[in-house]
């Protein structure tokens, strides 16, 4: 993996306070946020842009995962088809390249959304994560690391070209690409976990919009928090579909190891 760091513009935190509040009172939430940012390991802060795969350091495809995407449920595969599947898989491994980006933000679980329900806000962004599942996942967290990864438009164009030449090869290529993006996300997540571990932190399990009751509508703002369109060419449509299609967006929470 090839890694470079882009400086992050730190915008001031804004909190709406009741008009009755003492203007001389200390903003404890802002102080806590500043403290969290000071204590956050630099390797996790980001944004960090990562290139994964390619001819020099190819990503490996999980063959069982690829077969699952093809709808395989254990039935026998004829030798000719098995060879064809393996040929396409090796081609995707050799030429597939993923771009990823991640950044970490302080978590604010102290506010309510417009409907008066508890929510998660990522300080320094316009991200509000709604839903009981994500609230339970992050309510005690100090930080949230947002990760995005994509195989890019070259993969999309290759898939379309194969569709015109050989629908079977296109189906295999599509399944192999789905397995490849899973591999890339695993590598990106491992980088975050390694950085957290080096700082005495551990990460909880990965979560994505669409899991449980966390709505897909949050994807656009999460990608904006990473400036993912400019950095890795990843965007989201008004119908919440990510483009390019072989892309993933997720988040995790690095926390002290002694956290209960």
Describe each PLM feature range.
Residues 23-24, 259:
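Low-complexity, intrinsically disordered segments with a bias for serine/threonine
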Residues 137-141, 225-226, 243:
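Solvent-exposed alpha-helices and their adjacent loops that cap or buttress functional pockets
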Residues 7-8, 12, 19, 25-33:
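Short linear motifs in low-complexity or flexible loops
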Residues 166-227:
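Internal, well-folded beta-alpha domain core
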Residues 248:
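TRNA-recognition modules of translation machinery and tRNA-sensing kinases, especially anticodon-binding
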Residues 251-258:
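Conserved small/polar residues in nucleotide/adenosyl-binding loops
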Residues 36-173:
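Active-site helix-to-loop segments that bind/position phosphate- or nucleotide-bearing substrates
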């Amino acid at each position: 993996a090839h890694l470079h760091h882009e400086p992050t513009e730190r915008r001031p935190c804004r909190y709406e306070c009741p008009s009755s509040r003492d203007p001389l009172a200390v903003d404890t939430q802002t102080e806590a946020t500043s403290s969290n940012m000071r204590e956050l390991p630099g390797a996790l802060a980001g944004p960090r842009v990562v290139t994964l795969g390619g001819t020099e350091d190819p990503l490996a495809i999980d063959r069982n995962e690829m077969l699952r995407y093809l709808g395989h449920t254990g039935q026998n595969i004829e030798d000719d088809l098995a060879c064809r599947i393996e040929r396409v898989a090796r081609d995707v491994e050799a030429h597939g390249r993923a771009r990823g980006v991640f950044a970490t933000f302080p978590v604010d679980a102290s506010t309510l959304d417009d409907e008066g329900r508890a929510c998660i806000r990522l300080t320094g962004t316009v991200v509000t994560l709604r839903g009981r599942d994500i609230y339970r996942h992050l309510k005690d967290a100090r930080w949230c690391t947002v990760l995005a990864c994509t195989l890019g438009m070259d993969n999309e164009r290759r898939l379309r070209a194969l569709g015109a030449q050989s629908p079977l090869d296109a189906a295999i290529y599509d399944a192999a690409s789905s397995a490849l993006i899973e591999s890339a996300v695993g590598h990106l997540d491992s980088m975050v976990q390694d950085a957290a571990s080096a700082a005495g932190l551990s990460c909880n399990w990965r979560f994505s919009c669409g899991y449980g009751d966390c709505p897909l509508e949050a994807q656009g703002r999460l990608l904006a928090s990473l400036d993912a369109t400019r950095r890795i060419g990843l965007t989201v449509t008004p119908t919440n579909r990510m483009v390019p299609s072989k892309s993933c967006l997720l988040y995790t929470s690095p926390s002290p190891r002694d956290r209960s």
